From Swiss-Prot:
Disruption phenotype: Does not affect the accumulation of azaterrilone A. SUPFAM superfamilies: FAD-linked reductases, C-terminal domain (SSF54373), FAD/NAD(P)-binding domain (SSF51905), NAD(P)-binding Rossmann-fold domains (SSF51735). The gene is tazHJ. GO terms for molecular function: FAD binding; oxidoreductase activity, acting on NAD(P)H. The keyword NAD does not apply. GO terms for biological process: secondary metabolite biosynthetic process. Its EC number is 1.-.-.-. This is Dual trans-enoyl reductase/FAD-dependent monooxygenase tazHJ. It is an enzyme of class 1 (oxidoreductase). In the N-terminal section; belongs to the zinc-containing alcohol dehydrogenase family. The active site is at 455. FAD binds at residues 299, 312, 372, 571, 584. Pathway: Secondary metabolite biosynthesis. Keywords: FAD, Flavoprotein, NADP, Nucleotide-binding, Oxidoreductase.
């Protein structure tokens, strides 16, 4: 929930203009353009253009840019609004209809302009904004996904609804997954803005108050459709004492989301059903498509979504991406944040005098992080239309002897069939229950590890001021008594991802919910025995937090990943605690093996002519999955085991090791090396050889 306390004396109709405006300015100026936050020690010290300075959003943006220390604030608006813009803090205003507007802006900024917020965002404004950028290039933040002609000017756009951190759609067809990092930023920025409004440092755009209460809202929408009052786009409608005003915001333009064309070369002769549309399921689908096999993803949610804020991939995982499909790796690199150094640093967080426990070289641009949602966004762009079925909650699987296909049953009463079913449905996998069999077996479900995490995203300028450059732009792990913390940059380096783990001897109170409400006070208490650096990290977390329970499959591992023509992959097969940061990477390894096996199986079936083959199609596919099980089971189970143990080592809970630096370093090194240095090419060779043996080809 996003709430701001309105100062006494501010009229409701003024207050109702703040919600969308504050959110949009926060996203545009600070998340997209990277301005330092008001009140921080850093200052912008560069010029900025606010296109549409007399709009509600533009009026706020001018004031925030001034508070962030911009050396020169330029705006565009009608001449009759020049005085208004000046009163807000604009240094110069230009008429956007003036044919010489661009040149005047360039002259005013001495051709050095590199930051622009377009608060109108039409095709015409986009071209003007891009043209006004100086000769060294820059960035324009739009309110819509617009394009311009200049290649040296980066185009970004924001959508205020993402600040709620929830899935939403526009017109039922344009779907946007949850972005938890936007919610965390919005909470922080709204709290900051609350103080600025209370101190009188932010003035609202004058609203227009309509008549006829809620009924008048429709008149307001109609006026905006007809192009009336486009600049003052805030409306209040008096509806009574209990609800005095309503803020109506409408956009007359539509969003166009590009779709990847259907892959006409992908075959449907081998029907593959993937249950689950997270990173594990989508990477597998792309790997199959690369090999000419068109799968169908059955996702129980209404859209693609990933739980959690940050994610990183170790060197082995990046290698597996390239094997699976080089475009997957390219997509990952497009959204990653480059570390300040190519080292992973483990620190003793319990000693006031800083001490490095261990450092490991990651390789060039190794183990980089990104926002989970950003990576998934990039991946799904490559999925052909028709690859995904949303709102499909699996309830049963039927794999009968003699049947040509496996049947899937969903909670909405629908069914589907496929030759192969692969469960990528996460830690609470329904497919895992089928593979293991029996009624309510312990291995059907993950179990609480007696650790939970506080997660938070900290604005980078705030983190930089508190910790310095090295501790903010490079991956750090802080070890200590019964707790440990991880930090690394995400969101283009604008945010520091903080994950603070705590040991909990109690049982988890709610078996249905993996997150429960908490506060910063809880986190501060959990890390009170740590040094000032770690306490400073914890102190930067938001006041309202969640406790994220760490569940895994260590206590009751799946004895097999395969049953007949059904298998499980990723967290569905081997959910591990996140202390190695390797769970998603192992899912990519799984996907590489599965994609190659199904490709080999399909090639074998094409050559042998299914109708006359000595080995029936169903048997070939079973042997492919048996090969997958043989290749992946031991390594995946080891990951679950080592992840549990390394978490205990990080927190001084191994009696033989404690927090002894030499012993900790030795454990960290060999365990990480076994993950990072894994020979993916050799794994693929072993896979091919074993499958051929299964078929009697060698």
């Amino acid at each position: 929930m996003l709430i701001i306390q309105i100062p006494d004396g501010m009229p409701d109709e003024d207050a109702c203009t703040l919600g969308v405006g504050i959110t949009t300015v926060g996203q545009g100026l600070y998340q997209s353009l990277g301005l330092p936050l008001p009140g921080s020690r850093a200052r912008a010290n560069f010029p900025i253009l606010i296109y549409g300075g007399s709009t509600a959003t533009g009026s706020l943006a001018i004031q925030y840019a001034r508070l962030s220390g911009c050396s020169q604030i330029i705006t565009t608006c009608s001449p009759r609004h020049f005085d208004w813009a000046k009163s807000l803090g604009a240094d110069a205003s230009f008429d956007y209809r003036d044919p010489d507007c661009v040149q005047k802006i360039k002259d005013c900024t001495q051709n050095t302009l590199a930051h622009v917020l377009d608060c109108v965002s039409t095709s015409a404004s986009a071209e003007l904004c891009a043209a006004a950028i100086g000769s060294n290039g820059g960035t324009v933040s739009y309110l819509l996904p617009l394009k311009h002609q200049r290649e040296d000017v980066e185009a970004k756009y924001t959508l205020a609804y993402t600040a709620f951190g929830e899935y939403f759609s526009i017109a039922g067809t344009r779907k946007f997954e949850a972005r938890p990092e936007d919610l965390e930023f919005a909470k922080m920025f709204w709290k900051l803005s609350e103080g600025l409004v209370a101190e009188g440092k932010i003035r609202v755009h004058p609203p227009r108050v309509g008549k006829d209460g809620l009924k008048g809202v429709l008149d307001g929408f109609q006026a905006m459709r007809e192009g009336q009052n486009w600049i003052p786009n805030m409306y209040g409608y008096e509806v009574g004492d209990e609800c005095r005003s309503l803020h109506v915001w409408a956009d007359r333009r539509s969003l166009e989301i590009p779709r990847a064309p259907i892959d006409q070369n992908a075959t449907s002769n081998l029907d593959v059903a993937i249950v689950g549309g997270g990173i594990a399921g989508v990477t597998l689908a792309l790997g199959l498509l690369k090999r000419g096999i068109k799968p169908i993803i059955y996702e129980r949610g209404r859209s693609f979504r990933e739980i959690g804020a940050g994610i990183g991939f170790t060197p082995n995982a990046e290698w597996a991406m390239k094997v699976l499909d080089p475009e997957i790796h390219a997509a990952f690199k497009r959204v990653t944040v480059q570390n300040g150094t190519d080292w992973f640093i483990w620190m003793d967080g319990s000693l006031e005098k800083e001490a490095v426990v261990h450092k490991m070289y990651l390789g060039e641009r190794g183990f980089e992080g990104c926002a989970r949602a950003d990576f998934l966004d990039e991946l799904v762009k490559s999925l052909p239309q028709g690859t995904v079925r949303f709102s499909k909650n699996l309830v049963d699987i039927v794999d009968e002897d003699g049947a040509s296909e496996v049947r899937l049953k969903f909670s909405d009463g629908s069914t589907a069939s496929a030759h192969i079913v692969i469960g990528c449905d996460g830690i609470r996998s329904k497919v895992r229950q089928f593979v293991i069999g029996g009624d309510d077996q312990p291995a059907h479900h993950p179990h609480y590890t007696h650790k939970y995490a506080f997660r938070g995203l900290v604005p980078m300028d705030k983190a930089y001021a508190a910790l310095g450059q090295e501790k903010t732009d490079t991956r750090h792990m802080y070890l200590g008594p019964d707790a440990h913390a991880l930090t690394f940059p995400v969101a283009g380096g604008k945010l520091l991802n903080v994950v603070a783990f705590v040991t909990d001897p109690s049982s988890w109170p709610d078996g249905e919910k993996f997150t429960l409400p908490a506060s910063k006070t809880d986190a501060v208490k959990a890390f009170e025995r740590f040094n000032s650096t770690v306490r400073a990290i914890i102190d930067m977390l938001p006041e309202e937090l969640s406790r994220w329970a760490v569940f895994d499959t260590y206590d009751y591992p799946a004895p097999t990943f395969v049953r007949g023509r059904v298998c499980i992959s990723g967290d569905a097969a081997h959910a591990a605690a996140p202390y190695h940061g390797a769970g998603a990477g192992f899912a990519v390894e799984d996907a590489a093996v599965l994609a190659e096996l199904l490709s080999d199986a399909y090639d074998y079936l094409k050559i042998s002519d299914v109708e006359k083959a000595d080995i029936p199609k169903s048997v070939v596919l079973r042997k492919a999955l048996e090969t997958y099980n043989s290749i992946r089971l031991e390594r995946a189970h080891w990951l679950v085991e080592t992840s549990r143990h390394i978490g205990e080592i990080y927190e001084g809970q191994n009696a033989d090791i404690g927090l002894d630096h030499t012993k900790c370093a030795a454990e960290i090194d060999w365990r990480c090396r076994k993950i990072w240095d894994y020979d993916v090419d050799d794994m693929m060779k072993q896979t091919s050889t074993l499958f051929k043996k299964q078929l009697g080809m060698i």
